[in-house]
Swiss-Prot record:
The keyword Chaperone does not apply. CDD domains: Terpene_cyclase_plant_C1. Its cofactor is Mg(2+). Accumulates in leaves. Keywords: Chloroplast, Lyase, Magnesium, Metal-binding, Plastid, Transit peptide. GO terms for biological process: ent-kaurene biosynthetic process; gibberellin biosynthetic process; terpenoid biosynthetic process. It comes from Stevia rebaudiana. This is Ent-kaurene synthase 2, chloroplastic. Mg(2+) 1 binds at residues 528, 532.
Amino acid sequence: MNLSLCIASPLLTKSNRPAALSAIHTASTSHGGQTNPTNLIIDTTKERIQKQFKNVEISVSSYDTAWVAMVPSPNSPKSPCFPECLNWLINNQLNDGSWGLVNHTHNHNHPLLKDSLSSTLACIVALKRWNVGEDQINKGLSFIESNLASATEKSQPSPIGFDIIFPGLLEYAKNLDINLLSKQTDFSLMLHKRELEQKRCHSNEMDGYLAYISEGLGNLYDWNMVKKYQMKNGSVFNSPSATAAAFINHQNPGCLNYLNSLLDKFGNAVPTVYPHDLFIRLSMVDTIERLGISHHFRVEIKNVLDETYRCWVERDEQIFMDVVTCALAFRLLRINGYEVSPDPLAEITNELALKDEYAALETYHASHILYQEDLSSGKQILKSADFLKEIISTDSNRLSKLIHKEVENALKFPINTGLERINTRRNIQLYNVDNTRILKTTYHSSNISNTDYLRLAVEDFYTCQSIYREELKGLERWVVENKLDQLKFARQKTAYCYFSVAATLSSPELSDARISWAKNGILTTVVDDFFDIGGTIDELTNLIQCVEKWNVDVDKDCCSEHVRILFLALKDAICWIGDEAFKWQARDVTSHVIQTWLELMNSMLREAIWTRDAYVPTLNEYMENAYVSFALGPIVKPAIYFVGPKLSEEIVESSEYHNLFKLMSTQGRLLNDIHSFKREFKEGKLNAVALHLSNGESGKVEEEVVEEMMMMIKNKRKELMKLIFEENGSIVPRACKDAFWNMCHVLNFFYANDDGFTGNTILDTVKDIIYNPLVLVNENEEQR
């Protein structure tokens, strides 16, 4: 199938592009002979992102600044310790009377009303505490009275601890003779809800949670409970508001030192959490990897991960007192080859932590990289899926719809599975530039999300698409030149074979690896059909003999035109690989590629003879041959000569290398046999399911056998994952190991619903990777 002829490239239709980025891409196709303006834009964008790795930015919090402003001077209790914070409150009230990140003047139904209510009330209390800012207090009270009903609306997203903190602030305001024109019933209802929430926390031993929101406890404040969660920097959970309340209630010098350090760094206003640099930098790495642009920032990413690993080894509180940071650090460190255990994450993961959407989401991501031996200690981590399902079953407000979409995608497309380029496309299209996070109050960080990431990701995606289209055209010409299209018995799957590698080895510099992978994928498909239906035993044997002899006279030594075409195509591909691989490896690998092909064809011949002779092997005998005959060897093994590292003979002959291949191929064979069982059973072909039924325990039915085999696949996958991720004792370079892992993702994709290439929906995905333009969902929603 010539995909490029049957699909007109939609990239030529610029009206389909997102408006904000079409001008950038248009520039890349103009100004011939001059410096490409797009490259200049991209280089500038990359420089800005590189600088962000060094400079972490986080928005200031009016809520936390208000609590710091309430702190009395140790030397003069009737004076504020931080008058500069009071001045900031006076000068930073919004024109609707509120304080916070959102101005509600033109958007009265904005979903952050509860956050604005608690921030505004905290600021009012702080100003009243020191009898300043009467005008600001009155404007703030007017805002609260107009919006107080939102405090009890379930459809409004709640900051962490709102049901305890906001009623606590109301009590504080009442003690300061601040008169809110609210119904007594509403006030009583909130206090009752607060009491129930406090009882629930105490009964479930949620002291850590109560310490984090301790500024809302009022008369129930317990320093003996809170001080257990004081960190080395003097703070309570790195929270300025909780730390300020701790100093107000119990003049702890560590708390004051922390607050002084905050003001030294930030001036007259503070963020809602500090330090937060480690989490933010890890979020940068995660975002950049998800958007498919990590190849631009390898040095910066390595620096972040090295620093994170140092903190992990030293048991830094930034990691181990926060579930989200711990889960994110564990996942990124493990998949990048650092030796880390999930035990610290398991220790801090509890039911309360998983009720937070981001904590449950990150923990769920982490659950997919647990090894087999981790499962017993990681039971709480594995429960995260249940909490995510509960989250998306609840009514979503407008702000939570974005996180709900993330959750739905996480459950449908688990991290560390799926094809990299498909995931990248989905992540780009769903990317939210304005990624507001909610703790006790909302905050933004341009390091976590910004237009530069999106701009670079979109341009990089389109650049790769243009490369893919040219490579696919070249492959289609190669198929015709080698007469493979004339073999009527063979499936023509050029686009599918190329797609499988473009979706995994996507970087522009990996062109040789993609061509090698795709050519051998095309050839293994044709050869498989030849050994299956297209050739006689004599022809199959003759083809093997020609490859063994190598330097043959095709007119004399090939017994048929089919053998002639196949041998010449094989020789052309293998010689090309040998010549190109020499440039990468500085040695001749042709003999290894030939040997890989011979191993495959001999295994296929063995199966053909078994079928001819009606021989039924044992299940073990079948599998020892079938993992080779599944035909992944010629696809993956030659391709890894082109991914970067040099591979010695010692490496390619090592037990580690062989185990990688066997684990990958066994998964593929089992998936294939499960999905093709009914068809192959009717055709009388050998199949692992059929052999399992005939050789296994009596009375077992197909469903039981398939369930056992799926569990075997799952275990093999975890075993392979461990081999891929772990570096201790490994001699196979990580980039090479990743090729085996990528092929597993390819197999899962092709066999998700159908038997290999037969899926009707796969063509649309092929188009998405090679041809179709991106559709930026969030941008389109904003335009509407």
